[in-house]
């Protein structure tokens, strides 16, 4: 549901751009992201940190586009977001016992640490590349082409990358069974209960 709402925001941006230009599209994007955050809060009483980051960047760069009447700000937003995410994946690669992608998915898939680290590194490279590619398109081609690339290009690349990730995980990982999850939770509870005071 969350992915569908995020995709809807991009689609609305694209449609409004075709109807009334970049500034109306930017305003529509800000509204859609705000609505997504409000919806998630009222439904779950919690907003993931990724949604907060997206909201802050959209407000900053979208707001700057509207205030200064310069579309270059909103064109930078996807790249900044990708590079912020890349920094998070990279930091987890250097600090801590588990990389970020393992923390996100190891309750569903069991894989050796080496493969989690490779997958995490792949995310870093992909996010850095897609951020750079966004700026290349923004500065090299027309605004209309960039808007189309934002919807079809970046989204298409992300879907292809996720397919590749799923293929890699299917080769090197195994699905975590419900019984194993329950056993892990029971063991954790017993450890807490039996710890010395």
From Swiss-Prot:
Domain of life: Bacteria
TM ranges: 22-42, 48-68, 76-96, 121-141, 144-164
GO terms under cellular component: plasma membrane
Primary location class: membrane
Keyword set includes Cell membrane: yes
Membrane topology qualifier: Multi-pass membrane protein
The entry's keywords: Cell inner membrane, Cell membrane, Membrane, Transmembrane, Transmembrane helix
The keyword Transmembrane is assigned to this record: yes
One Pfam family this sequence matches: IspA
Compartmental location: Cell inner membrane
Family affiliation: Belongs to the YciB family.
Function noted in UniProt: Plays a role in cell envelope biogenesis, maintenance of cell envelope integrity and membrane homeostasis.
Protein name stated in the entry: Inner membrane-spanning protein YciB
Gene behind the chain: yciB
